[in-house]
A protein has these predicted regions:
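Stable alpha-helical elements in mature extracytoplasmic
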Residues: 2-5, 28-36, 103, 107-110, ...
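A recurrent domain-boundary module in secreted/ectodomain proteins
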Residues: 122, 127-148
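Glycan-binding loop/region signatures in secreted carbohydrate-active enzymes
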Residues: 47-117, 138-148
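Hydrophobic residues within beta-strands of alpha/beta enzymes
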Residues: 9, 121-122
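Substrate-binding surface in catalytic domains of secreted glycosidases
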Residues: 1-81
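Acidic-and-aromatic substrate-binding clefts and catalytic sites of carbohydrate-active enzymes
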Residues: 17, 59-61, 100-102, 127-132
């Protein structure tokens, strides 16, 4: 059994995307809840070792993933709203498309969920986050009562 000999597990509750099904979010709140429930309640992982993975990037749905994944900071620079979870963006040679990401509202909900039933959150990757008041890491820290 692996659980007793590992300090923590990063549960990657993201990248659940489709290249053929449009309007599918790759990392919504429901997926976070489902993943934590599966590992803690179904597989028996100690909640004290379960760390919820949160993305600081967005993915489109229903189109190729090549050169269409954008950092959260890039999404905001193209007019994305830090409180929402989708935006219409443009990535170079592609026409405008909808990208799905976690805004501050969803990150706060996920941070609260992870604080309530697990050991916290981790982000993939910090450099993709916004460096200002729109920061996802700051939103999570504020939610769980930690300094940023």
């Amino acid at each position: 059994e692996l659980f007793p000999v590992v300090d923590f597990f990063n549960i990657m509750a993201y990248d659940d995307f489709s290249t053929t099904v449009p309007y599918r979010h790759h990392s919504d709140y429901a997926l976070a809840s489902l993943c934590l429930n599966y590992w803690i309640n179904t597989r028996g992982m100690p909640a004290s070792k379960a760390v919820l993975g949160v993305p600081a990037y967005g993915r489109p749905s229903g189109i190729t993933q090549t050169n269409t994944v954008l950092s959260y900071r890039n999404i905001l620079s193209q007019g994305g709203n830090p409180q929402l979870d989708s935006a219409v963006v443009n990535a170079g040679s592609f026409s405008n498309y909808t990208i799905y990401y976690n805004g501050q509202y969803t990150v706060k909900r996920k941070a609260k969920l992870a604080k309530d039933i697990a050991a916290g959150v981790m982000f993939w990757e910090k450099w993709q986050d916004a460096p200002d008041a729109n920061s996802l890491l700051k939103a999570a820290c504020d939610t769980v009562g930690r300094s940023y």
